[in-house]
Amino acid sequence: HDLCRRQRQMCIRDRQHFKNFSQWMKNEKIEMNLLTGKTKKKEWEKINEGLISGKTKILIGTHSVFQKRVSLNNLALVVVDEQQRFGVKQRFEILQKTSKNLMPHQLFMTATPIPRTLAMTMFADLSVSKIDEMPPGRNPVSTSVMSNTKRDELIERLEVICKNGNQAFWLCTMIEESENLDVQTAEASKKWLEEKSSDLKVGLVHSKLTKNQKDKAINEFREGTIDVLVCTTVIEVGMDVPNASLMIIENAERLGLSQLHQLRGRVGRGPDMQAHCILLYEGELGETAEARMSAMKETNDGFKISEIDLEIRGSGEILGTKQSGGMELKIADLIRDAQFLDK
């Protein structure tokens, strides 16, 4: 009678997981449900009834699961995917929903652990498993850093890549222009690309578009009718296009290491493909931004990137809610001296 819950951040991936779980469990007579922010009220009430009665055994959901009105009966296992995208309080809220005499097992999955999580693997009683090999047929993504003043040089490269049958992401950190920030926007970049090259078929996807508009752009990109998809970080998870071989990130200095690594992972997913990621930056790089760029050029290993992120940002609070910041150790260093913790 125990309930298993799998939590994802993106609605697209939730539907994929639900489809996969339904296929795996089709002969087991195990009832499962999907709960997202788009779930209609009538359907939600039916799902909640199943949770209260214990009829529902597996619940797959997004942040919607955190709502107070969602009841979790006999919760025995919590699987949190893309763990770096969830806050401490959110994960704690799930445990608050459980029976007082039942503490569920928890499995956290992440390609790039946040500093606090990495520190917890050293201090806390956590069992850690690492998959430190690339999937079969996958090659590391080559990463380079360029000043935004050289962005015109990328047009020819885009045209060559697309003529060879591959596709590219052009990622921006903002949708529309801001009076306070000097950054490249998605809408302006799409217009600029179309003006620079009549050969490129350019699409656009961001959070302000309707669901139908987003689905249309994403499907056209997957089908290959769009060469370059101008986008925001909405494509960080859940976007699997094996034909995409180039990721260009505008104003990369504004993004964290974990996010940069996740975005880079959107390309090079095809068999034996050599993919590239270009990080564009505006103005002079600060010390922290330069350290992030160097880390991205240096390695494709998510765990190594997490260690560098820990060094840059600090470990945060093991018993608090801060997920980064200094631990104020006077002599010890968490990364350098990790082997002493076991002793």
Outline where the language-model segments fall:
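Loop/turn-to-beta-strand initiation segments
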Residues: 31, 54-58, 74-77, 101-107, ...
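Conserved nucleic-acid-binding Ia/Ib motif block in the N-terminal RecA-like helicase ATPase lobe
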Residues: 13-59, 199-204
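C-terminal helicase module of SF1/SF2 nucleic-acid helicases/translocases
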Residues: 151-166, 185-192, 196-343
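Conserved interdomain linker/interface between the two RecA-like ATPase lobes of SF2 helicase motors
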Residues: 125-189
